């Protein structure tokens, strides 16, 4: 798994790095939002810039993001985590983003709604096991991405009350009281 981490607290970043490397994850650590965006853009460019017979062309953007996960602190120097997430999702809306923050959960949840994309939150402090479990839980993220697409389709077709209720029944199993929520 390839993970980009933006965390301004050196000790926390070091803890993440050691734990993720023990799991054999390829981890890139940055200490601020500006560096995080630079690394993300560089990796994205590597994916989209191809050279054939000394001719350079840009391939169409892939749905395949350059990192499996971008793990962001919410409050960071230069550019905050929310603005980093906005920029990344504008480049690749399929990128999985997880906020790891001690910021007030309700305020953070309200803030990330403006992204209009699926992002995850893991509330600090948390155990390394909780972090690893969140990172490895790809199935829930994939299902929620699918539901996000379904919601966009629902908006486009102007559904009946009965159709909305049917969709709510499908979504109900994902309504959990875990320490982190998906938006």
Identify the meaning behind each predicted range:
Residues 7:
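Conserved acidic carboxylate
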Residues 14-18, 22:
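Charged docking surfaces used in two-component/phosphorelay signaling
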Residues 32, 80-84:
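Acidic catalytic/metal-coordinating carboxylates
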Residues 73:
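Active-site residues of response regulator receiver
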Residues 76:
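Receiver (REC) domain active-site loop signature in two-component systems and cognate sites
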Residues 83, 90, 103-121, 128-133, ...:
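Alpha4 helix (beta4-alpha4-beta5 surface) of REC/receiver domains from two-component response regulators
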Residues 141-183:
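CheY-like receiver
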């Amino acid at each position: 798994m390839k993970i980009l981490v933006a965390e301004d607290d050196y000790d926390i970043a070091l803890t993440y790095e050691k734990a993720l490397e023990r799991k054999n994850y390829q981890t890139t650590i940055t200490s601020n939002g500006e560096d995080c965006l630079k690394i993300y853009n560089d990796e994205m460019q590597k994916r989209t810039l191809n050279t054939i017979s000394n001719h350079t062309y840009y391939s169409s953007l892939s749905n395949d993001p350059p990192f499996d996960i971008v793990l962001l602190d919410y409050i960071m120097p230069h550019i905050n985590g929310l603005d980093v997430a906005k920029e990344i999702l504008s480049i690749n809306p399929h990128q999985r983003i997880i906020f790891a923050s001690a910021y007030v959960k309700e305020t953070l949840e309200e803030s990330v709604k403006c992204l209009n994309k699926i992002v995850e939150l893991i509330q600090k402090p948390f155990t390394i096991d909780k972090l690893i479990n969140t990172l490895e839980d790809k199935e829930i993220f994939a299902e929620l991405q699918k539901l996000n697409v379904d919601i966009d389709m629902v908006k486009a077709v102007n559904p009946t009350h009965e159709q909305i209720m049917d969709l709510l029944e499908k979504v109900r199993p994902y309504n959990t009281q875990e320490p982190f929520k998906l938006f």
